[in-house]
Amino acid sequence: MTTIVKRALVAAGMVLAIGGAAQANEGGVSLHKQDWSWKGIFGRYDQPQLQRGFQVFHEVCSTCHGMKRVAYRNLSALGFSEDGIKELAAEKEFPAGPDDNGDMFTRPGTPADHIPSPFANDKAAAAANGGAAPPDLSLLAKARPGGPNYIYSLLEGYASDSPGEPAEWWVKQQQEKGLEVAFNEAKYFNDYFPGHAISMPPPLMDDLITYEDGTAATKDQMAQDVVAYLNWAAEPELDARKSLGLKVLLFLGVLTAMLLALKLAIWRDVKH
């Protein structure tokens, strides 16, 4: 059994080492690891940060991305009022019908509706974005290796605000390998995107929006806030799950102590 465990640990170490090396070879840089508020057994989401993150998504990201797995009514968990949620939902039009004449029509959104894509379909989305349809963001924080750290790094990883301008480290790397230094003039260079050529322009810049709570809207602040919101969208039950886990651990601890005390009481007068 000991030998099996040792072999498993060695294999796991090799996998991690290979994975790290592959990431370094492809990206040239490591992910920016952030101290997220929800990490650790006692970590929890920061509700004001989630509200700011939704504001970034709503005012910036939603022009290209949808969140089909998040209903407007779910935003009540972020502290939004019922009236505020109704107002947000009503900003969007949803297909409905047919009417009495058999014609389809549109209606204002309701809290039961899910946050839609701004495009009618994937082909329309791809046509409007250089051939690549922007992904739905509902589960992005769980779907990408590195999760929130990857998304944050991606948002911060643009080499230039202009397309066709690769990072200096990449140019040097190509030259050292004797390869042609050629980069797609229509793409933006990103340290963390696979292949480094991304169609999405840098989405964030300082003071792009005005936070409703008065927080300074720096690029870094907006990146952290929207990543927090995306992680909540992917794991909205995280706080409840951790609270339940702590209660279970507390219960098991008390139960163990009671059983131990009971055992000692039963066997106290028994001679061994």
UniProtKB/Swiss-Prot annotation:
Lipid metabolism listed as a keyword: no
Entry annotated with the keyword Iron: yes
GO CC annotations on file: plasma membrane
Signal peptide: 1-24
Residues that coordinate or bind heme c: C61, C64, H65, M200
Predominant localisation class: membrane
Superkingdom to which the source organism belongs: Bacteria
Pfam families referenced in this protein's UniProt entry, alphabetically: Cytochrom_C1 (PF02167)
An MF annotation (GO) of this entry: metal ion binding
TM stretches of this protein: 244-261
Key words, A-Z: Cell membrane, Electron transport, Heme, Iron, Membrane, Metal-binding, Respiratory chain, Signal, Transmembrane, Transmembrane helix, Transport
Localization of this protein: Cell membrane
Posttranslational mods: Binds 1 heme c group covalently per subunit.
Membrane topology: Single-pass membrane protein
PANTHER family membership: CYTOCHROME C1 (PTHR10266), CYTOCHROME C1, HEME PROTEIN, MITOCHONDRIAL (PTHR10266:SF3)
Subunit description: The main subunits of complex b-c1 are: cytochrome b, cytochrome c1 and the Rieske protein.
Function: Component of the ubiquinol-cytochrome c reductase complex (complex III or cytochrome b-c1 complex), which is a respiratory chain that generates an electrochemical potential coupled to ATP synthesis.
Protein name: Cytochrome c1
Organism field: Rhodospirillum rubrum
Species classification: Bacteria, Pseudomonadati, Pseudomonadota, Alphaproteobacteria, Rhodospirillales
